[in-house]
Amino acid sequence: MDLVNNLNDRLLFAVPKKGRLYEKAVELLKGSDIQFHRHNRLDIALSTNLPLALVFLPAADIPRFVGEGRVALGITGIDQVREAKMDVENALDLNFGSCKLQVQVPEKGPYTDPKQLIGKSIVTSFTSLAEEYFAELEGVPVKDITTNIKFVGGSVEAACALGVADGIIDLVESGETMRAAGLKPIATVLETSASLIVSKNPSHPELVQMIKSRIEGVLAANKYVLCNYNAPRDKLDALLKITPGRRAATVSPLDDEGWCAVSSMAEKKKIAQIMDELKKEGASDILVFSISNCRV
């Protein structure tokens, strides 16, 4: 198959090709019914049910491809968007890939405050963000900082042990890798997570909006459950405060005039507590249903 010629008239959607965001991104695409098959060693996959093509790229490159309009939309971390300094729309927080960009120093070293690193050597994969951070600490423009910012593409945590750096700035998820390298955090530069980003002038804007709507539906389905129960009318106001829904609960009359049926979306992580509170306030026949997908 000539993939290049088959890209004509297709929306291009950039996806991380590997790393911490890849698996969750692919799971999100499947939940949004974006069907595709990725051939071995190929970084382009044509959708079999929509006029789009997935382009698998390093997460760090995706903001530039989207910002320059080479692809219409993409999934990457906010840290990568900020580092690339590209003008894109952050369309959706995707609720995965959460981590922190932190200043880390040797556990047994003399540094306890990032200001102590001014004028020292810092190793990072995020040179732009590091320069901005130290420019603010030093109170000078980026071009005038005295801190020596060095770029490495990987294994940043080894820099201090190898004598290359006094401290590092790197992404930290659980912190286990940093602790294993004998490092400790002394400051957070940025909190980040995965985001759906969109070009300012995308091709196929209607298809972009449809994909965004589908992804919003998957995110809502993952976050919420449907809670149904019967409510005494004289307790309805109190019960609706417990289950207000995303916008409003659905209230339906029952044959018994003293009762009504309530249906409401509720946060999945809070549902046990919500059910306890409903029962305490007089609700009965409380049922909870999973939401496989939705549009919000």
Swiss-Prot record:
Pfam families: HisG, HisG_C. PROSITE patterns: ATP_P_PHORIBOSYLTR (PS01316). GO terms for molecular function: ATP binding; ATP phosphoribosyltransferase activity; magnesium ion binding. Pathway: Amino-acid biosynthesis; L-histidine biosynthesis; L-histidine from 5-phospho-alpha-D-ribose 1-diphosphate: step 1/9. It comes from the Eukaryota. GO terms for biological process: L-histidine biosynthetic process. One of its GO terms (cellular component) is cytoplasm. Its main location: cytoplasm. Its EC number is 2.4.2.17. It is found in: Cytoplasm. It catalyses: 1-(5-phospho-beta-D-ribosyl)-ATP + diphosphate = 5-phospho-alpha-D-ribose 1-diphosphate + ATP. Keywords: Amino-acid biosynthesis, ATP-binding, Cytoplasm, Glycosyltransferase, Histidine biosynthesis, Nucleotide-binding, Transferase. Signal peptide: none annotated. Belongs to the ATP phosphoribosyltransferase family. Catalyzes the condensation of ATP and 5-phosphoribose 1-diphosphate to form N'-(5'-phosphoribosyl)-ATP (PR-ATP). Has a crucial role in the pathway because the rate of histidine biosynthesis seems to be controlled primarily by regulation of the enzymatic activity. NCBIfam families: hisG, HisG_C-term. This is ATP phosphoribosyltransferase. It comes from Yarrowia lipolytica (strain CLIB 122 / E 150). The lineage of its organism: Eukaryota, Fungi, Dikarya, Ascomycota, Saccharomycotina.
